[in-house]
Regions:
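N-terminal beta-alpha lobe that positions the nucleotide/phosphoryl donor
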Residues: 2-261, 265-271
Length: 271
């Protein structure tokens, strides 16, 4: 789809390499994109190219016409991921991580339960669906609190609040913009270091590709911050925790394909 702040050229790069890899395996490839500025819409990249908006109505017409073996959503960013639920509901095969796993990763409450089950540390959190619930939760979480809606990437709607007035205003604003959304409130780890791991998994074995350390403190969206590869300031103990957590999370989600996990590190504990 179109370039937006926090979502752009990296997904074009992923799509091109995904198409090339599928072609090498002998598959006919079909690319759907409405952005003429991208490499993935060059005439010689995919076998077939549809210049269509990445909306369900258009996608479904193409799928009915082409009858593909499956659809890959994990290379197109949030725009493509949002289509997974409808693809799953209409019985279209998603190649790679299933819709069930994608939904588990994007639903903040369910994902936090998964962390609890796998003994992975996480900041104290709660899930709220109304402003009253959020205010009640703030009593046990202690400020500052990080507020995030579910089912968004790119840091959309994410804010650190420091008192009840801020919290109420932000929650009301979010629920007006995204009705019926579950909001995750967690205690903001002040002064924590942020790191992230990229890995690839086939559902059985996890291969960690790289671990990056962010220069800016935790809470600044990764699209707005700089990261170094390899990390410049993480000890062996912290690195081992990151590797262990990445392995556990990738396998618990039944990941098939790529996964990116972001961590906060405070007092040598990886959250």
């Amino acid at each position: 789809g179109p370039n937006r702040i926090g979502q752009g050229i990296e997904f074009d790069y992923c799509c091109v390499h995904g198409v090339l890899a599928a072609s090498e395996c002998g598959y006919e490839t079909i690319m759907i994109n409405c952005n003429p500025e991208t490499v993935s819409t060059d005439f010689d990249v995919a076998d077939k190219l549809y210049f269509e908006p990445v909306f369900w109505e258009h996608i479904y017409d193409i799928i009915q016409h082409e009858k593909p073996e499956g659809v890959i959503v994990q290379l197109g960013g949030q725009t493509a991921l949002k289509l997974a639920e409808k693809l799953d509901r209409h019985g279209v095969k998603i190649i790679g991580t299933t819709y069930k796993s994608l939904d588990l990763a994007e639903d903040r409450g369910s994902f936090s339960e998964l962390l609890k089950k796998n003994n992975i540390p996480y900041p104290e959190f709660g899930v709220a669906e109304t402003a009253d619930q959020a205010l009640k939760l703030s009593d046990s979480l202690n400020f500052p609190i990080l507020v995030r809606p579910s089912y968004v990437l790119g840091g959309q709607g994410m804010k650190i609040v420091i008192n009840k007035e801020d919290l109420e205003a932000h929650v009301v604003d979010l629920l007006q913009k995204i009705p019926n959304n579950k909001l995750l409130l967690d205690h903001y780890l002040d002064g924590a270091i942020e790191a992230e791991a990229d890995a690839i998994c086939d559902g059985k074995k996890v291969q960690i590709i790289g671990i990056m350390e962010h220069i800016e403190p935790c809470g600044i969206h990764s699209g707005d911050s700089n990261a170094t590869l390899p990390p410049f300031n993480l000890g062996d103990f912290v690195m081992q925790q990151i590797k262990d957590h990445t392995n556990k999370i990738a396998l618990a989600l039944n990941t098939v394909g790529l996964i990116n996990i972001q961590f906060a590190i405070k007092n040598d504990i990886v959250y």
